[in-house]
C-alpha cells in the first residue's frame, strides 16, 4: 500500500511533463491514466498514448522534492482529473496514502481528498530497449535540428512516411536530417564530435515536437537508444519513448539542385516582414500566392486580390546576381523557412519560374538548406 509525502509543486511539474504523453480521448481507456510507481529509490510517473510514452523519475535524493517514502506500490489514476486535484491543493506539502486497494487519500494543509484508482497490472508494459551504446547529443543541438526540420514534414496521413523526419547517420559521424511534405523540404547536415553506430530512422514529427517541449534546456545531454520499431531519448530523470515510422523514406538528394540562374541575398527579418504583409492579402486570393519579380537588380513582391486589394512592395536586398525572373509561391512556406533560420542573412537561389528554389543561411557556415516548390500561375 503506497504511502509517501512530496513537495506539491515539484510533483505537479513532473505530472504535467508526463501528461504530454497522455490523451484523454484515447481509444484504449486505460491510456488516459497516469501510472504512479513507488520504489525505494523514488517515484516514477508513467504516461503513454500508444505512440509516445514518458517515464519521469523523482529521486529520493532530490532535495527539492522533499520526498519521504513510507511504503511502496503502484496505482493508476485518471490523469487530467488527478492533476487538477493536485494543483488545487492548498499547502506546499502533499501526503499521498493508499488506504485500501486502489483507493488513495491526498492530504495537504487542512484539505483531505479521497480518490479511486485502478489496478496498475492493467497498464500495458513499455517495450524494453536494450541499453547498447547510446548516441549522446547536446539537448540544445538536437532541439535546434528539430526546429530547423520538423516544420517541413507533412501533416497529411495519406503518405505516413512524410509525417516524419528522416535521421541518417553514415560513416559513424555524418548526421543528415530531412523533412518534406513534397511542396517544401528542409535538410540539416552536421558532423558529430564522437563516432557512433550508423542508423537510418524516420521519427514522427509530432513526437519530436513533444520531445522539444519535455526536454528543457537545463537538461544538458540526451542519450538516444534504438530498437526495431522505436527509439528512446533518455536523460537522468526522463525517458521518452516514441514509435518509429515504417517504410522507406524517399530519396531526397536527387531533388536538390546545384546550378542556378538567379541568386539574391536578403536580410531575414526584412524579407519575413514583407512576406507577412503580402500574406495578409494573398490569403484572400484563389491560389494564395505571392509573385516575386526580379528585374534589373530590383526585387519586388506583388499580390492582387480582386476582392480585397493589392500589394506592391520593393524589397531591400544585399546582393542580386543573374537573370531576371518572375516566380509565384505560397508565402507561408517562405515565412516558415525564414523562422527556422538562425542567421541574419539568407541567400535564395532560383533556376526558373517552375523549378524549386533553395534557401541557405548567408552568414554562417552551417550546412542547412531548404527547398520550396513554386506555384504555376496563368
Curated annotation (Swiss-Prot):
Keywords recorded for this protein, A-Z: Cytoplasm, DNA replication, DNA-binding, DNA-directed DNA polymerase, Nucleotidyltransferase, Transferase
GO cellular component: cytoplasm; DNA polymerase III complex
Location relative to the cell: Cytoplasm
MF GO annotations: 3'-5' exonuclease activity; DNA binding; DNA-directed DNA polymerase activity
Pfam families for the chain: DNA_pol3_beta, DNA_pol3_beta_2, DNA_pol3_beta_3
Assembly notes: Forms a ring-shaped head-to-tail homodimer around DNA which binds and tethers DNA polymerases and other proteins to the DNA. The DNA replisome complex has a single clamp-loading complex (3 tau and 1 each of delta, delta', psi and chi subunits) which binds 3 Pol III cores (1 core on the leading strand and 2 on the lagging strand) each with a beta sliding clamp dimer. Additional proteins in the replisome are other copies of gamma, psi and chi, Ssb, DNA helicase and RNA primase.
Family under the similarity heading: Belongs to the beta sliding clamp family.
Protein name (record): Beta sliding clamp
Lineage, broadest ranks: Bacteria, Bacillati, Bacillota, Bacilli, Lactobacillales
Amino acid at each position: 500500500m503506497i504511502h509517501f509525502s512530496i513537495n506539491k509543486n515539484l510533483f505537479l511539474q513532473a505530472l504535467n511533463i508526463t501528461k504530454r504523453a497522455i490523451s484523454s480521448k484515447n481509444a484504449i481507456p486505460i491510456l488516459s491514466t497516469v501510472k504512479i510507481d513507488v520504489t525505494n529509490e523514488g517515484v516514477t510517473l508513467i504516461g503513454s498514448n500508444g505512440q509516445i510514452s514518458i517515464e519521469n523519475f523523482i529521486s529520493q535524493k532530490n532535495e527539492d522534492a522533499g520526498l519521504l517514502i513510507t511504503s511502496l506500490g503502484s496505482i493508476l489514476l485518471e490523469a487530467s482529473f488527478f492533476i487538477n486535484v493536485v494543483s488545487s491543493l492548498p499547502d506546499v506539502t502533499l501526503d499521498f496514502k493508499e488506504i485500501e486497494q486502489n483507493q488513495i487519500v491526498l492530504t495537504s494543509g487542512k484539505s483531505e481528498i479521497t480518490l479511486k484508482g485502478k489496478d496498475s497490472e492493467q497498464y500495458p508494459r513499455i517495450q524494453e530497449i536494450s541499453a547498447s551504446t547510446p548516441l549522446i547529443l547536446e539537448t540544445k543541438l538536437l532541439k535546434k535540428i528539430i526546429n530547423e526540420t520538423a516544420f517541413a514534414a507533412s501533416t497529411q496521413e495519406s503518405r505516413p512516411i512524410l509525417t516524419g523526419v528522416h535521421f541518417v547517420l553514415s560513416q559513424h559521424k555524418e548526421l543528415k536530417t530531412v523533412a518534406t511534405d513534397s511542396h517544401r523540404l528542409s535538410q540539416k547536415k552536421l558532423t558529430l564530435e564522437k563516432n557512433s553506430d550508423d542508423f537510418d530512422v524516420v521519427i514522427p514529427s509530432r513526437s519530436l515536437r513533444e520531445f522539444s517541449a519535455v526536454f528543457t534546456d537545463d537538461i544538458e545531454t540526451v542519450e538516444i537508444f534504438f530498437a526495431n520499431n522505436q527509439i528512446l531519448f533518455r536523460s537522468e530523470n526522463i525517458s521518452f519513448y516514441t514509435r518509429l515510422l515504417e517504410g522507406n523514406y524517399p530519396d531526397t538528394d536527387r531533388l536538390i539542385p546545384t546550378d542556378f540562374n538567379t541568386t539574391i541575398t536578403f536580410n531575414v527579418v526584412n524579407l519575413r516582414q514583407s512576406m507577412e504583409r503580402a500574406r495578409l492579402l494573398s490569403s484572400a486570393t484563389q491560389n494564395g500566392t505571392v509573385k516575386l519579380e526580379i528585374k534589373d537588380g530590383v526585387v519586388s513582391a506583388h499580390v492582387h486580390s480582386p476582392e480585397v486589394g493589392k500589394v506592391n512592395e520593393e524589397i531591400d536586398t544585399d546582393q542580386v546576381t543573374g537573370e531576371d525572373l518572375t516566380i509565384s509561391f505560397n508565402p507561408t512556406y517562405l515565412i516558415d523557412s525564414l523562422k527556422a533560420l538562425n542567421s541574419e542573412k539568407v541567400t535564395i537561389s532560383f533556376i526558373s519560374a517552375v523549378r524549386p528554389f533553395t534557401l541557405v543561411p548567408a552568414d554562417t557556415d552551417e550546412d542547412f538548406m531548404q527547398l520550396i516548390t513554386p506555384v504555376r500561375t496563368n
